[in-house]
């Protein structure tokens, strides 16, 4: 009766198929890495537990796939209910498992493990509470599964020994194995009185072992690796069936080089190796604690999510209020219901709109209590306060400069690496910061939201407006320590300081000439390349510098703003007026130098000389060689 209960699942005995979960290929793709690893661990643990009870008569397709490191999904075309009912799926020789025609094999319901199902009742399948002692250290464990896992902590011991069947051969993951496969098409039959190579160790020991259907030897199945070793009676390996998974080779390939433990799939080996390397790749974003396994991180994050019943279906983030979840969903949908009335920009949250409006109003409500500096955002004030407290945990390894936050260090690091990850889709120009790209894109849109209240001139950047306003106020906050000269911009002061130091950091790669400003180097390079990027829209003439183009444009304009105060003549360029005024200066100087003759007066004559279209006047003294009545 007890043997029948073990053989017949209908009478309450659990089979591996009863606790197996199947996924299609589409469903398997939807699982993340942590969920896949958890599924593999659970399936292998279930198989090991049922195998330890002697209820496994063949290796499941799912377990075979996991042992080979393959994805354990099943085709959508397979009807798992009918396949499991007739015992077809996963059976050795079945179409689904090996792709060959099924042979006449004993079914799962009428095959019993020799030496297991005959002398054991369901009550005897599990050990009583902590009544399974370890024969190495004497520790008592509650069942055979925990005992098998515990015995792996004795890597140099050899606990699995079959003294009657294989003398001196010990079942250990640290020993080399003799892999033998039984030909499932020709089951081995023994005559009466002869030793069977597939006979189990149940005849020789009372340990709860299971039969290896490939090598014919008993093994202990644990929740991570299975161990098996066999030496057949005839000393010769049997022919392996084509397509049968060589479980022993999988164990040999997935062996830990540190402890010698062998695993039936590579993912389990990778997880095991983290014990030796102490690697903890999974970090909690809330508290920064690291974990070895993704499942442990998922379990830990539930501590932070207590009191947050609202979960985002897109990213799995939890929120304590439904309104916060609604606002968060706009990140995935791209919805931006809040619009700025000044520039028309949209925002997903009202708080972001309030912060943006301070750009137009210039409001800075957050004041630093140490230096009195104001900020438009609270986060900027918090970062600024670290300057006074001296908290600069992030230091650049290249130049030693310290930063208050890691993001600032990352931005600074691009100065050394030259990285420019942000590209403008309009002109293809690259930038090192996203803020620089946003400001640059205004050049293409032509937007100038920042207007000067004095002259009405508009600018695309607020910083440019602040610099321009110093023209009206006359403010020059930057002073040179050497000569005391004042400047309205810090860049002008830096360029001026190089006059005192003689520093010329910008070198031309073509001729080796040095310059004290980058703009001067750029203008100089155009001499080598012949580039003339500035073109006159009137006549098409090109220039190397923008200032030369501005001067040229005055030729086409009718206005002549520069007028001579002596003769009233007007000019379109100031240098031309200065050259013209030198004519009047020479005229006055000649009148003072030449002594007037009593009979003749100095006469001023002019002659045209085509020097760039200008008229040069030459002072001549027209005087005869002798006066009338004089003797030469």
Curated annotation (Swiss-Prot):
Record's keyword annotation contains Nucleus: yes
Subcellular location: Nucleus
GO terms under biological process: regulation of transcription by RNA polymerase II
SMART domains: KRAB (SM00349), ZnF_C2H2 (SM00355)
Protein name listed in UniProt: Zinc finger protein 792
UniProt KW keywords: DNA-binding, Metal-binding, Nucleus, Phosphoprotein, Repeat, Transcription, Transcription regulation, Zinc, Zinc-finger
SUPFAM superfamilies registered for this protein in UniProt: beta-beta-alpha zinc fingers, KRAB domain (Kruppel-associated box)
Protein family according to the UniProt entry: Belongs to the krueppel C2H2-type zinc-finger protein family.
CDD domains membership: KRAB_A-box
Protein's gene: ZNF792
Source species of the chain: Homo sapiens (Human)
Pfam families noted in UniProt: KRAB, zf-C2H2
Record-level GO cellular component terms: nucleus
């Amino acid at each position: 009766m007890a043997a029948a209960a073990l053989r017949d699942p209908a009478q309450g005995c659990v089979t591996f198929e009863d606790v197996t979960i199947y996924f299609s290929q589409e469903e398997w793709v939807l699982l993340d890495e942590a969920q896949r690893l958890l599924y593999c661990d659970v399936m292998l643990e279930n198989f090991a537990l049922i195998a330890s009870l002697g209820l496994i008569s063949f290796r499941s397709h799912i377990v075979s796939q996991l042992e080979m490191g393959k994805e354990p999904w099943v085709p959508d075309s397979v009807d798992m209910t009918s396949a499991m009912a007739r015992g077809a799926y996963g059976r050795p020789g079945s179409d689904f498992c090996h792709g060959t025609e099924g042979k006449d094999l004993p079914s799962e319901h009428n095959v019993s493990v020799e030496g297991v199902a005959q002398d054991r009742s369901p009550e005897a399948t599990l050990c009583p509470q902590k009544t399974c002692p370890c024969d190495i250290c004497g520790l008592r464990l509650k069942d055979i599964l925990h005992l098998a896992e515990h015995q792996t902590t004795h890597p140099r011991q050899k606990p699995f020994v079959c003294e009657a069947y294989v003398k001196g051969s010990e079942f250990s993951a640290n020993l080399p194995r003799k892999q033998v496969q039984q030909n499932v098409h020709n089951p081995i039959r023994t005559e009466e009185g002869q030793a069977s190579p597939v006979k189990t160790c149940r005849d020789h020991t009372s340990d709860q072992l299971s039969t290896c259907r490939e090598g014919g030897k008993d093994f202990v199945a644990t929740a991570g690796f299975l161990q098996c070793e066999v030496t057949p009676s005839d000393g010769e390996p049997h022919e392996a069936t084509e397509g049968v998974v060589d479980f022993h080779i999988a164990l040999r390939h997935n062996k830990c080089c540190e402890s010698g433990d062998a695993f039936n799939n590579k993912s389990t080996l990778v997880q095991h190796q983290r014990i030796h390397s102490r690697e903890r790749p999974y970090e909690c974003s809330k508290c920064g604690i690291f974990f070895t396994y993704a499942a442990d991180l998922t379990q830990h994050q539930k501590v932070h999510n207590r009191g947050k019943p609202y979960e985002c279906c897109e990213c799995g983030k939890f929120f304590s209020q439904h309104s916060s979840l609604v606002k968060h969903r706009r990140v995935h949908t791209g919805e931006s219901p809040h619009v700025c009335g000044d520039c028309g920009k949209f925002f997903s949250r009202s708080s972001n709109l309030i912060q943006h409006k301070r750009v137009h109003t210039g409001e800075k409500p957050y004041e630093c209590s140490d230096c009195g500096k104001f900020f438009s955002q609270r986060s900027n004030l918090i970062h600024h306060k670290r300057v006074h407290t001296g908290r600069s945990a992030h230091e650049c390894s290249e130049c030693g400069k310290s930063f208050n936050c890691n993001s600032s260090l990352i931005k600074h690091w691009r100065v050394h690496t030259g990285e420019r990850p942000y590209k403008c889709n309009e002109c293809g120009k690259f930038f090192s910061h996203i803020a620089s790209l946003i400001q640059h894109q205004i050049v293409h849109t032509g937007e100038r939201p920042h207007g000067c209240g004095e002259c009405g001139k508009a600018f695309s950047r607020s910083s440019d407006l602040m610099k321009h306003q110093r023209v009206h106020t006359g403010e020059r906050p930057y002073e040179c320590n050497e000569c005391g000269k004042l400047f309205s911009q810090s860049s002008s002061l830096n360029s001026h300081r190089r006059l005192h130091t003689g520093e010329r950091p910008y070198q031309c790669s073509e001729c080796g000439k040095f310059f004290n400003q980058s703009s001067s180097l750029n203008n100089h390079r155009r001499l080598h390349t012949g580039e003339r990027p500035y073109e006159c829209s009137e006549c098409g003439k090109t220039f190397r510098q923008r200032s030369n183009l501005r001067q040229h444009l005055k030729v086409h304009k009718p206005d002549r703003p520069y007028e001579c105060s002596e003769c009233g003549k007007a000019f379109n360029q100031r240098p031309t007026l200065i050259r013209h005024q030198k004519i009047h200066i020479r005229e006055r100087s000649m009148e003072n130098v030449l002594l007037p003759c009593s009979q003749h007066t100095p006469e001023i004559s002019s002659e045209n000389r085509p020097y760039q279209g200008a008229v040069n006047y030459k002072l001549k003294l027209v005087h005869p060689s002798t006066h009338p009545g004089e003797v030469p």
